Regions:
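Anaerobic metallocofactor- and corrinoid-dependent redox/one-carbon enzyme cores
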Residues: 2-671
Length: 671
């Protein structure tokens, strides 16, 4: 039986989304929100109790002591299902890293049209990690050798993947002792599938040990490679002004929405859209020009580097088409709904697929090739412009918010100390003193089974009140952007007194936008630098920090969570657990759930837990942060200790007569 249909307000916390959901209902068009209401999740598969890896099944285990046809127990089945999901997520992000490495190779050899090395400093810095000779060599020579090194990590069969040497020393020792330092990125993913094939690995803890190894191959391998190469080719992000939400679409311009995850495509479309040839072509079609905007992680990529506006996050992909104002949605890989083509048939929008890995029946396919990138980008834009004349009635929401994205770990290092003394020391000192209680990384997807954006923004808002500095990536970052949390002055009246002092003194927003979902490796880099700076322990598991994915839905999220746990982080997911079982009926169904929490914590110092209630999620976050503070011997968090200093306080003091100012500052009267 379908559950009760939700109102637009219950389906999304975003007014722009609500407006488009109402329009969809008026037009009789279904969306992910209505499909989620009409299609209740399978309670057996959703709890990880269904096995379908062979032709003897599918086997559903719903009773105490029940096994599959082959004799597989519930813990074996759940461990296999979870590991396969982690392998799929790791494959998706790591394959993206592979493509980026090949693009770097082509650019270094002058074989990639329109691409060149934008950040030579980042190139030299990354190369130095791996003892690649940089003195007396051109950027292209360095990039060519770095690309070869990175490409080799995917097919390597023995040894250790090299990007992981950048982890803290104590963490690397744990990985070696546990035998989970990945040998090669592809090898671990292949072995994960082999181990979970019927008749293979049947010990849940042993299976999950390899899940960790597979995830690490992504986080400290493929994803880290992707972020490094993106910065080298397109520039390391620094703060820039942007906008977010459906109101960024323009009535008098050709609207092209790019959606997916590959910056090689989106960055080139940005370049092509600014070409005088394309601008003139759009004007001849009756438009003022081309308005680019992004959806999902592609949005974050072009937002944080060029300031191109974000039309929204994952659940906005259908809603943007519902405006009737989008000439083309250009997609590549990951998080792309097959429903887009059917939806677009109700309007004039063209769905253009571009990746050799992704085709959607009914979509226009223009395959992207980095060797002819600019030419193909212009072809895509011209096809979009040609569609402008077919536009019908439009309804573009007015909602949009300014934001400041682009806080790479390099920029955070710079902003804390400036050009001559860049350092994480001020951040560490702020945590040690208690001005910053701890750090929360709030990341991940939207899920139409929850109220879109609400969990992201509620958790963010409540943690800010408790002096927790928040860093965000992916769709979670766009959720906060749509509410204006990513501006320097935004919400400081609702931020705890200590965090407010830090934000005012440095000139940063209380929520730092750190990029796309693949850029979660930037957070690992920040945590590593925090450890290396000193004062907050000698490994990541000692830092007062928590990772949260309140609205997760993707296998990639499970891979990210696992490599963060293996790096020492406490990770909390909202929503349903994929390995929950039915503990009220099956006492052996929580073995896997306990192992990824208590078992992994004992081994790695990090743990993964699923907490659907947002208030319990916040409580668990603060308890963990406070425990880590106590373990480090730091002062107990006390919000009353702060709030009377910082730039705002100095401005207040300047208004006082000189005789009163000294007494206010030093507590003694003037002579």
């Amino acid at each position: 039986m379908a559950k009760k249909k939700r109102t637009p307000q219950e389906q999304s916390a975003d007014p722009a989304a609500q407006e488009m959901i109402i329009r969809a209902e008026e037009l009789g068009i279904g969306t992910a929100f209505t499909r989620a209401d009409e299609m209740p999740p399978c309670n057996i598969g959703g709890a990880g109790m269904c096995c379908k890896i062979c032709g003897m099944g599918p086997c559903r285990l719903t009773k105490e002591g029940q096994t599959g046809v082959c004799g597989a127990t519930i813990d074996t089945i759940q461990a296999r299902n979870l590991t396969r999901a982690i392998a799929a997520g790791a494959a998706a992000h790591s394959d993206h890293g592979r493509d980026m490495a090949f693009t770097l190779k082509a650019a270094a050899n002058g074989e990639a049209e329109g691409y060149y090395i934008r950040d030579v400093a980042k190139l030299r810095n990354v190369a130095s990690y791996y003892d690649i000779e940089i003195e007396g060599r051109s950027p292209e020579e360095i990039a060519d050798e770095l690309a070869d090194l990175y490409i080799a990590q995917f097919g390597q069969q023995k040894g250790e993947i090299i990007p992981a040497i950048r982890a803290p020393e104590k963490r690397k020792k744990i990985w070696k002792e546990q035998g989970v330092w990945p040998r090669g990125i592809d090898r671990e993913t292949v072995e994960a599938l082999h181990r979970t094939h019927v008749g293979d690995d049947q010990d849940a803890e042993h299976i999950l040990q390899h899940a960790v190894k597979t995830a690490l191959a992504d986080g400290w391998g493929g994803s880290m490679i992707a972020t490094d190469v993106s910065d080298i080719l397109f520039g390391t992000p620094a703060p820039i002004l942007g906008q977010a939400n459906l109101g960024v679409l323009k009535e008098d311009m050709v609207n092209v929405v790019v959606h997916g995850h590959e910056p090689t495509l989106s960055q080139m479309i940005v370049a092509a859209s600014q070409d005088p040839e394309i601008i003139e072509y759009a004007k001849k079609a009756g438009a003022k020009g081309v308005q680019l905007s992004g959806i999902c992680c592609t949005a974050n990529e072009i937002l944080m580097r060029q300031g191109i506006p974000a039309a929204g996050n994952f659940l906005h992909q259908e809603l943007s088409i519902l405006t009737g104002a989008v000439e083309a949605m250009v997609v590549d890989v990951q998080c792309i709904m097959q429903a887009l083509v059917g939806l677009a048939e109700n309007f004039h929008t063209k769905i253009i697929t571009t990746s050799p890995k992704v085709k959607i029946k009914g979509a226009t396919h223009i395959e992207f090739d980095e060797h002819k990138a600019l030419t193909i980008a212009k072809q895509i834009l011209k096809e979009s412009i040609d569609n402008y004349k077919n536009r019908g009635k439009t309804q573009i929401p007015s909602d949009k918010e300014d934001l400041i994205p682009g806080f790479s770990h390099e920029y955070i290092n710079y902003m804390l100390g400036g050009s001559y003394r860049s350092s994480f020391r001020p951040l560490n000192d702020a945590v040690m003193s208690g001005r910053i209680r701890g750090v929360a990384a709030i990341v991940g997807c939207n899920n139409p089974r929850t109220q879109q954006d609400w969990l992201h923004t509620y958790v963010t808002r409540e943690l800010l009140k408790q002096d927790v500095l928040v860093v965000e990536t992916g769709c979670g970052a766009i959720a906060s952007a749509k509410l204006g949390y990513l501006l320097g002055e935004a919400g400081l009246d609702k931020v705890g007194p200590g965090l407010k002092e830090v934000c005012e003194a440095i000139g940063i927003p209380p929520v730092l936008h750190m990029g796309s979902c693949v850029d979660n490796t930037r957070i690992l880099t920040v945590l590593t630098q925090v450890v290396e700076e000193g004062g907050l322990g000698d490994d990541i598991d000692q830092v007062p920090a928590v990772g949260l994915a309140p609205e997760w839905m993707s296998e990639k999220a499970l891979a990210i969570a696992t490599y963060c746990v293996a790096s020492g982080a406490y990770v909390i997911f909202g929503g349903a657990s994929p390995v929950s079982g039915m503990p009220d009926r099956m006492s052996d169904s929580d073995i896997v759930l306990k192992h990824i929490s208590e078992g992994w914590e004992e081994i790695y110092g990090g743990k993964l837990e699923f907490i659907p209630d947002p208030d319990e999620m916040i409580k668990a976050t603060l308890e963990h942060i406070d425990k880590k503070r106590a373990d480090l011997g730091l002062p107990e968090y006390d919000p009353d200790r702060f709030g009377e200093s910082g730039d705002a306080r100095m401005l207040e003091l300047e208004e006082l007569p000189l005789s009163e100012r000294r007494e206010a500052i030093y507590g003694v009267a003037a002579d």
